[in-house]
Amino acid sequence: MESTFSSPAEAALQREAGVPGQFTPPEDLDRVYELERVTRFICDLGCQRVALQFPDQLLGDAGAVAARLEEVTGSKMFILGDTAYGSCCVDVLGAEQAGAQALVHFGPACLSPPASLLPITFVLGRRPVALELCAKAFEAQNPDPTALVVLLSEPACAHALEPLATLLRPKYQDLLISSPALPLPVGSLSSQPESLERFGRRFPLNPGRSLEEYGAFYVGASQASSDPNLDPDLSRLLLGWTPGRPFFSCCPDTGQTQDQGAKAGRLRARRLYLVERARDARVVGLLVGTLGVAQHLEALAHLRKLTEAAGKRSYVLALGKPTPAKLANFPEMDVFVLLACPLGALTLQPSGGFFRPILTPCELEAACNPAWPPPGLAPHLTHYAELLPGSPFHVPLPPPESELWDTPDVSLISGELRPPPPWKSSDDTKCSALTPRPQLELAESSPAASFLSSRSWQGLEPRLGQTPVKEAVQGRRGIAIAYEDEGSS
């Protein structure tokens, strides 16, 4: 049945969901998915049940990969797809529900520390890279052989950084090569104990050097992309990189480069705008965007403490993957804060399709903590773990008697003066003897009550005792699209 207000019932069966899947030729499965290394990982652990996690675009190969691994290892494989949150995070909950003893993650990964001690290995992929073209592009953008530059890449191009560095090292002696911060095998020691770990990567810095001194050359961004928004991995790097240092991206297929300085400036400007929106907000929705990343419960408690200290009301919402339709059910919220891994938190920005802006935890920290940022710290963090106690970037809330809470604050959006937190008493104890007793006109100020009073429809009227009592009668039968008492059209 089809009408002006509904689609035909057959449309739900004919609709193609998700993105087109990838089908790799059988002879290339071993190379693309590194099955030899995965087999060695499973056999060394002696696992009998293994979970294989695939993103949507790789589910077409999931069956063939699982069958090949079962044949070689003799272990039982479980395919994990359609994760409740971002596919870049390991689905440790799904693996534990399947009784898996280990997990293999295929595809792009944020490499955030998991909340479980389950053995995990990552297969990031091996995207082809034109080394000669990328080397020429690097030399064109860095004519000074003494320049401090670090080589970065998207996860699928990480395998090409060492060969690229081999071509460049005869000329560039101070070249720094990053590597994915993959978990080390159980019982092994890192060969680079002094390496700095940041942005999901390891940087083997020389003594006396800091990452803030280096420019960046990123292999992986493509100028042929039709999406005007930056991918989350590159956005994460641009936000956290030192302002003023050169940052170039290079397409691994063509070797074409692009200066990302202007895009980094737009990202930081958008972050400042979101901070202002968070400062103006009275009701904040905390969206749970991960259950598999370490310290997510501590981060949730930290965000609730922040909003309470700033005099804001917060609500925790566990909705799975956020969509405009889901969040539209909560019009009381002024802003939403997505508690997720760095890539998941940046995936929804810019949040043009949502009726309220979606922030990252770092933006809420900058809005609610008057002591943020401390001198010498750039406020462009991307991971919520960097805000928690124990992190070198943690900034505790100032005490209630601190003058930071009394600093005049004017909204850059509305131009109005923001009031201090409600718990901050404005009464002067020296003049309390002359203060008249209040008449209790306002018992309590509630953002929810203010929002309800401003709505044109406030719900059904109870009208207790005013409605006549009637006997129950049989109602309509059927579904909303076609009740039984309606004729077919």
From Swiss-Prot:
Tagged with keyword Iron: yes
Annotated positions of the Phosphoserine modification: 7, 446, 456, 488
Annotated InterPro entries: DHP2, DPH1/DPH2, DPH1/DPH2_1, DPH1/DPH2_3
GO CC annotations, alphabetized: 2-(3-amino-3-carboxypropyl)histidine synthase complex; protein-containing complex
Cofactor binding note of this UniProt entry: Binds 1 [4Fe-4S] cluster per subunit. The cluster facilitates the reduction of the catalytic iron-sulfur cluster in the DPH1 subunit.
Residue numbers bearing the Phosphothreonine modification: 435, 467
Binding site for [4Fe-4S] cluster: 89, 110, 341
One Pfam family matching this protein: Diphthamide_syn
GO biological process terms on file: protein histidyl modification to diphthamide
Required co-factors: [4Fe-4S] cluster
GO MF annotations, alphabetized: 2-(3-amino-3-carboxypropyl)histidine synthase activity; 4 iron, 4 sulfur cluster binding; metal ion binding
Record keywords: Acetylation, Iron, Iron-sulfur, Metal-binding, Phosphoprotein
Sites bearing N-acetylmethionine, chain numbering: 1
Pathway it works in: Protein modification; peptidyl-diphthamide biosynthesis
Keyword Zinc: no
Assembly and interaction partners: Component of the 2-(3-amino-3-carboxypropyl)histidine synthase complex composed of DPH1, DPH2, DPH3 and a NADH-dependent reductase. Interacts with DPH1.
Role according to the record: Required for the first step of diphthamide biosynthesis, a post-translational modification of histidine which occurs in elongation factor 2. DPH1 and DPH2 transfer a 3-amino-3-carboxypropyl (ACP) group from S-adenosyl-L-methionine (SAM) to a histidine residue, the reaction is assisted by a reduction system comprising DPH3 and a NADH-dependent reductase. Facilitates the reduction of the catalytic iron-sulfur cluster found in the DPH1 subunit.
Family, per entry: Belongs to the DPH1/DPH2 family. DPH2 subfamily.
Protein name: 2-(3-amino-3-carboxypropyl)histidine synthase subunit 2
Organism: Rattus norvegicus
Gene name of the encoded protein: Dph2
